[in-house]
From Swiss-Prot:
Record keyword Transmembrane present: no
GO MF annotation: an example: lipoate synthase activity
Domain Radical SAM core: 46-262
Residues the record lists as binding [4Fe-4S] cluster 2: C60, C64, C67
A single GO cellular-component term on record: cytoplasm
List of residues binding [4Fe-4S] cluster 1: C34, C39, C45, S273
Keywords for the protein's UniProt record, in alphabetical order: 4Fe-4S, Cytoplasm, Iron, Iron-sulfur, Metal-binding, S-adenosyl-L-methionine, Transferase
SMART domains xrefs: Elp3 (SM00729)
PROSITE patterns for the chain: RADICAL_SAM
Protein name in the entry: Lipoyl synthase
Transmembrane regions: none
Pathway assigned in UniProt: Protein modification; protein lipoylation via endogenous pathway; protein N(6)-(lipoyl)lysine from octanoyl-[acyl-carrier-protein]: step 2/2
Length: 295
């Protein structure tokens, strides 16, 4: 594989604010996807006091080929975690929060009720905080979406991760159309919730396959699409097929807008929760503007 190009090089994380966020995460015994997934944007985000909390432990029941999170038999859920999450968010002073999780196929509802408890605990401390959740597919368990919908998240994100043809190699224990159906069900049951999904480029997909995923997501009513470069976290993960240049990401962005997405993030370093607060604000402004036009 070719060497990593310059456009993917980032500064080593550090600084006083970064250290403060690190200390807070440790104090409240929280996991973050920023660390567990070896996100390249951790330095920038943490220096803005933005951290994506990963709930339900640090051990996943899946074994996706792209992911750096540990795989195995997870511990029982920590009943105090929602309270710690709420306290940490309050301490950080965040106005928009992103909560994600490992897959917990061992739980009857896949962890949906734990997500809902975390959302409620955050809002109990500050009802003005907006909450974005990035969930697994819950193995299609029918109760999961209803449980989460009852907590009224502002943004529901579930990532397709890659094109259907590559699922057997990239997400061998997941099904593409299960994920699409989840996103459609969320929108059908909660039309006011912004829905969001992302997938990685550079795994061997073709342009035609990328366009088809866009069409599938639009048919599912998804508002916001995210496309970023896959980066191999360790030598044990699936290799990068190619590094997609920024100009190609720009072409995908233009196509996605042409297909009707309200918001598109497409760049080599784009990630699901990267600039999430700014993007949510833009989505709200766009919805308000459209409502005014239709009055």
């Amino acid at each position: 594989m070719e060497n990593k190009p310059d456009w993917l090089r980032v500064r080593m994380p550090g600084g006083a604010v970064f250290d403060e966020v690190t200390e807070l995460v440790r104090r409240y015994e929280l996991n973050t996807v920023c660390e567990e997934a070896a996100c390249p944007n951790i330095g920038e985000c943490w220096n803005k006091r933005h951290a994506t909390i990963m709930i339900m432990g640090s051990v996943c029941t899946r074994a996706c080929a792209f992911c750096n999170v540990k795989v195995g038999v997870p511990n029982a859920l920590d009943p105090d975690e929602p309270e710690r999450v709420g306290a940490a968010i309050s301490k950080l002073g965040l106005k928009h929060v992103v909560i994600t999780s490992v897959d917990r196929d061992d739980l009857p509802d896949g962890g949906a009720s734990h997500f809902a408890k975390c959302v409620r605990e955050i809002r109990k401390r500050d009802s003005s905080v907006t909450v974005e959740i990035l969930t697994p597919d819950f193995l299609g368990k029918p109760c999961a979406i209803d449980i989460i919908a009852s907590a009224r998240p502002d943004v529901y994100n579930h990532n397709l991760e890659t094109v259907p043809r590559l699922y057997s190699r990239v997400r061998p224990r997941a099904k593409y159309f299960n994920s699409l159906n989840l996103l459609k069900e969320v929108k059908d049951k909660s039309p006011g919730v912004f829905t969001k999904s992302g997938f990685m480029l550079g795994l061997g997909e073709s342009k035609e396959e990328v366009y088809q995923v866009m069409d599938d997501l639009r048919c599912a009513g998804v508002d916001f699409i995210v496309m970023g470069q896959y980066l191999q976290p360790t030598k044990n993960n699936i290799e990068v097929h190619r590094y997609v240049p920024p100009s190609e990401f720009e072409q995908y962005k233009l196509m996605a807008y042409a297909k009707g997405f309200s918001m598109v993030a497409a760049s080599p370093l784009a990630r699901s929760s990267y600039h999430a607060e700014d993007d949510f604000r833009k989505l709200k402004e766009l919805r308000f503007a459209r409502a005014k036009v239709n009055e």
